[in-house]
Amino acid sequence: MSSRNDWPLIPGTVIAHSSAATGKYIGSPGLAILPDGSYVAAHDHFGPGSSEHGISETWIYRSTDRGTSWSPSCQIDGAFWSNLFVHRGALFLFGTSRHYGYAVIRRSDDGGLTWTTPTDSKTGLLTNTPEYHCAPMPVVEHKGYLYRAFEHRSPGTGWGTNFTSGVFRAKLGADLLDARSWE
């Protein structure tokens, strides 16, 4: 783990570093503050040395001292382009299963140490076809709903023209791991 002194030209605290020589680059950064005041950060790996096109990986870190120091909590396989958010006391990670994968959501009830696994439409697998794309965009609460932007692509129609933008939304009281809760 890095400390402030390892990177004197960077303000704040470096949470994670991946040498360019590995071909694994840090992307999709995210941050959430838990009800107990702990901070949780996330990132995925992309690049030629990564597994973004197969079983992608997202790393979760936790700080209990307002970001001064960080400890790795876990690695989540099958999570990419994901964002963290807190809803009704639980921590969620919402993104894709891999580069152009399925839309998936996971829940942690212990501050990011363990996570649900999206294996079907009741446990966080929100789409039955892949080709979803997104970034670690915020989940927005408005007028009784949660909203999350996504894109879907249709391969073979040409770069740029093969993407359509959309929004997932769910009622505030819904089970967010149930695909039927999302419109």
Regions found by a protein language model. Give the residues of each.
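Beta-rich carbohydrate-recognition and catalytic domains
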Residues: 1-28, 32-81, 85-135, 140-183
